[in-house]
């Protein structure tokens, strides 16, 4: 790859087909939506529009009706306002804090893992390494799923590695196809912006099931992202065999 021959080994140019930039910007929102729909299709009783999550988020001092009448905050308004911000503006903002991880994981680690272990094994190993990197925070402070959740702490550690494989693969594909580290940085920033939004649709008590969904870091809600990662990797492997 030409970008590996650059002095830093990282592709810094703003380049690549428009399709990949659009996929990076809007793809995480689409996958998050699909994951939430799948989760609530499996667990329809957990879909909650009462505003109980908002009540807890605002400190519990006002009930849902008071939040609507005095502050104009409802589940629908929260989803619309924060969803529009997360989709339209946040990827550009979050791109910069995400850039550091992208330089390290996708820019430096992934090309070398794929060169040594092959496409599929490299992406599998890269996802596990990225996931395990977060384990200390997960065990010490409840990063991602909290400390009291279904199957804690073992299930969360395993699920997080599955999620990291899926996300790492999609980010790696974006970098591979564009040779520009800015593209996966945008996608990473977009994912960080939108991922927590489905949580407003469950009660605080259902945070116990966060390891399953409705956020795309849950096993069930992550299935669309995982399916996309596996399908794209298998397609890429078939193309390599033909060549």
Placement of each model-derived feature along the sequence:
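Membrane-interface interhelical connector segments
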Residues: 62-70, 138-152
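Membrane-interface helix/loop boundary segments of multi-pass membrane proteins
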Residues: 99-132, 172-180
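C-terminal membrane module of polytopic membrane proteins
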Residues: 147-156, 189-243
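Residue-level signature of the transmembrane alpha-helical core
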Residues: 25-29, 87, 91, 95, ...
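Kinked, hydrophobic transmembrane alpha-helices enriched for aromatic residues
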Residues: 129-141, 184-203
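Hydrophobic alpha-helical transmembrane segments
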Residues: 64-94, 157-167, 214-223
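Transmembrane alpha-helix/helix-exit interface in multi-pass inner-membrane proteins
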Residues: 36-48, 101-102, 123-143
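Membrane-helix interface linkers and caps
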Residues: 1-27, 38-61, 97, 112, ...
């Amino acid at each position: 790859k030409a970008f590996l021959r650059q002095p830093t080994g990282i592709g810094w140019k703003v380049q690549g087909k428009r399709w990949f930039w659009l996929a990076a910007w809007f793809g995480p929102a689409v996958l998050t939506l699909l994951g939430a729909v799948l989760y609530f299709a499996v667990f329809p009783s957990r879909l909650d529009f009462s505003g109980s999550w908002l009540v807890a988020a605002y400190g519990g001092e006002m009930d849902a009706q008071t939040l609507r009448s005095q502050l104009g905050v409802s589940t629908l308004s929260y989803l619309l306002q924060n969803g529009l911000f997360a989709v339209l503006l946040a990827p550009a903002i979050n791109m910069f804090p995400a850039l550091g991880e992208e330089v390290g994981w996708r820019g430096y680690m992934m090309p070398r893992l794929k060169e040594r272990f092959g496409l599929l094994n490299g992406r599998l190993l890269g996802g596990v390494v990225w996931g395990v990197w977060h384990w200390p925070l997960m065990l010490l402070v409840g990063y991602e799923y909290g400390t009291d959740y279904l199957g804690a702490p073992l299930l969360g550690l395993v699920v997080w590695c599955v999620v990291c494989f899926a996300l790492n693969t999609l980010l790696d594909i974006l970098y591979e196809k564009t040779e520009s580290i800015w593209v996966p940085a945008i996608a990473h920033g977009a994912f960080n912006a939108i991922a927590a939004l489905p949580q407003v649709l469950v009660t605080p008590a259902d945070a116990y099931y966060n390891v399953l969904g409705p956020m795309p870091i849950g096993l069930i809600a992550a299935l669309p992202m995982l399916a996309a990662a596996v399908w794209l990797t298998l397609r890429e492997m078939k193309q390599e065999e033909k060549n």
